[in-house]
């Protein structure tokens, strides 16, 4: 947008040869002169201008998430941003003495500025009255009056003229100073703090007046600077607020954009699915936004969805996330810079030497451990943004998820190193396997928790699989049972990523075994263990069979026994399930040659 604005600026300068006026530095006195004595006129020349300047203001809804009037925070941020950019004094003078730009009085007029005759005459009258009053006071007090009575009359007339003219000037200065120290933001915040006034219609009228004043000021600056102005408000963090407050912000945006000549552009940086859910769940939007996507289509004039992140872009983001970890070698550097603590002066020389040697050995050992940990962490993080490795393909196109993975890797590697120190005879996972396990737990927490829960249940039952068995095989053996629990685990299943990528991850690229999973599970910190507990409870409840009703001798003849009914139902169910299983396997063989699990 800035490049487009610069290009249009250069083209406009070549066309009209008029330089834009400055509004800062030495241009402020000229701007104040125009504000007080000249009236802007919207001419055809101004409407044909193509050069534009963008003013960017960022609004984080998270900062105002705790207030009831989130949309009021939007308006105050807008007012404060414009006031900060152009200065408090010009806006204060315009609030008191400024005039709204008007259209041309006749179609042939090309002048953009007209003299404000009323203001000039009023100012001349005040100055003349002030000079007259000062002169009369000078005559009455200087002894130039012929008589004592005339001297009193001159003194009274001079005092009245001086008081009236001076009070008029002082009132104007006082109003400018009041607007200079009391900004629009403070006004709106003061109105919001009044609970009774906030629920009345007058509150919205006052806010609308402030917004109209802001719009007129921007229109004045457009004519003065000889360029078009557009205020771009970037709204972020809206998906972290309550639905009612999200609706309030959208209503405020629609109110600000209701004027067709409003110089505002709003950019909503938000997930549309979350925004649509907020609109549908808001109580005050029933009947208006029953379908949140239709409401957004009526509100948003330019939808722009960020495309899928490319390979180079993802690697660059991962590289930046890794570089932001400035604490990888911090511990090693601080150990080298720590001053040596003085020994105990009262102890013997041998005791001091022994303590120094012991402390030196401990520091050297800890230094080697920290250096090895830093090396492993660096190796693991390099696997994330290595173009020759396939691990980056499983990282989501989300900066927040990237940082979550990068922040988890050092902790996992540290815990693995400590575990290997306790068991030096065992060969632990490599740093690449550690970061792959972190990605697995971050991308598919439900499926990974299901595999781990199945392993735990089989181990408790005494039929644990071998350590060389693959996790993918365990998942295939229990995928049908997981399919029957989709309704109970719907919210948890929504956390998982692409199922096909999960199959390729565990089946081909990273075939973790049961032994590796049990070793890595002790060092896993980014997996919610409550998911496994919930799955264990559901499996335990589904394993319970209802007791069969008691057998009645009187019903043996005319009716079949419940056992026979249950057996018949079981046989029919088995035939149906076997038929569906055969059909499913036949359908899968046409695609891959072996049956695929249902997950």
Swiss-Prot record:
Residues 543-599 are annotated as: Disordered. It is found in: Membrane. The keyword Metal-binding does not apply. It is a multi-pass membrane protein. GO terms for cellular component: membrane. Residues 1-416 form the KAP NTPase domain. This is NTPase KAP family P-loop domain-containing protein 1. It comes from Mus musculus (Mouse).
């Amino acid at each position: 947008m800035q490049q487009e604005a610069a290009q249009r600026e250069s083209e406009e300068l070549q066309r009209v040869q008029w330089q834009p006026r400055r509004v800062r530095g030495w241009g402020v006195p000229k701007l104040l002169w125009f504000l007080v004595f000249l009236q802007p006129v919207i001419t055809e020349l101004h409407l044909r201008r193509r050069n534009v300047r963008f003013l960017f203001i960022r609004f984080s809804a998270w900062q105002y998430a705790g207030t009831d009037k989130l949309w009021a925070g939007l308006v105050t941020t807008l007012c404060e941003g414009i006031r900060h950019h152009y200065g408090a004094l010009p806006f204060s003078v315009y609030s008191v003495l400024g005039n709204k730009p008007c259209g041309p009085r006749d179609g042939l007029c090309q002048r953009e500025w007209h003299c404000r005759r009323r203001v000039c005459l009023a100012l001349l009258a005040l100055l003349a009255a002030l000079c007259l009053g000062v002169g009369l006071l000078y005559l009455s007090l200087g002894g130039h009056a012929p008589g004592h009575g005339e001297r009193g009359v001159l003194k009274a007339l001079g005092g009245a003229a001086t008081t009236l003219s001076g009070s008029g000037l002082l009132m104007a200065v006082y109003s400018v100073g009041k607007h200079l120290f009391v900004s629009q933001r403070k006004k709106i915040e003061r109105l919001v703090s009044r609970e009774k006034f906030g629920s009345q219609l007058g509150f919205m009228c006052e806010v609308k007046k402030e917004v109209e004043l802001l719009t007129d000021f921007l229109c004045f600056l457009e004519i003065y600077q000889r360029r078009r102005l557009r205020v771009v408000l970037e709204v972020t963090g809206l998906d972290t607020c309550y639905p009612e407050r999200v609706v309030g912000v959208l209503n405020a945006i629609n109110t600000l954009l209701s004027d067709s000549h409003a110089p505002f552009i709003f950019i909503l940086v938000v997930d549309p699915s979350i925004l649509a859910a907020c609109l549908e769940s808001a109580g005050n939007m029933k009947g208006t936004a029953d379908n949140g996507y239709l409401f957004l289509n009526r509100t948003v004039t330019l939808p722009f969805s960020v495309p899928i992140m490319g390979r180079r872009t993802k690697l660059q983001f991962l590289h930046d996330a890794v570089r932001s970890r400035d604490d990888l070698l911090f511990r090693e550097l601080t150990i080298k810079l720590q001053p040596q603590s003085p020994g105990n002066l009262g102890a013997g020389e041998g005791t001091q030497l022994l303590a120094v040697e012991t402390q030196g050995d401990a520091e050297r050992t800890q230094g080697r451990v920290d250096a090895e940990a830093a090396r492993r962490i660096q190796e693991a993080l390099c696997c994330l943004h290595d173009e020759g490795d396939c691990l980056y393909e499983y990282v989501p196109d989300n900066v927040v998820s990237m940082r979550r993975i990068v922040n988890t890797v050092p902790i996992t590697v540290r815990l693995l190193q400590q575990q290997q120190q306790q068991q030096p005879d065992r060969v632990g996972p490599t740093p690449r396997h550690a970061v792959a396990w972190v990605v697995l737990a971050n991308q598919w927490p439900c499926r990974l928790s299901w595999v781990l829960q199945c392993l735990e249940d089989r181990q408790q039952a005494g039929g644990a699989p071998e350590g060389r068995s693959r996790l993918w095989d365990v998942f295939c053996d229990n995928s049908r049972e997981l399919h029957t629990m989709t309704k109970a685990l719907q919210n948890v299943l929504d956390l998982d990523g692409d199922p096909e990528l999960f199959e390729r991850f565990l089946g081909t690229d990273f075939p973790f075994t049961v032994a590796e999973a049990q070793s890595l599970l002790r060092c896993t910190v980014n997996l919610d263990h409550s998911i496994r507990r919930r799955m264990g409870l559901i499996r335990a409840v589904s394993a319970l069979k209802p007791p069969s009703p008691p057998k009645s001798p009187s019903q043996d003849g005319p009716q079949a026994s419940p056992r026979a009914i249950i057996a018949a139902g079981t046989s029919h169910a088995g035939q149906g399930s076997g038929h569906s299983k055969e059909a499913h396997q036949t359908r899968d063989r046409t695609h891959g040659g072996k049956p695929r699990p249902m997950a």
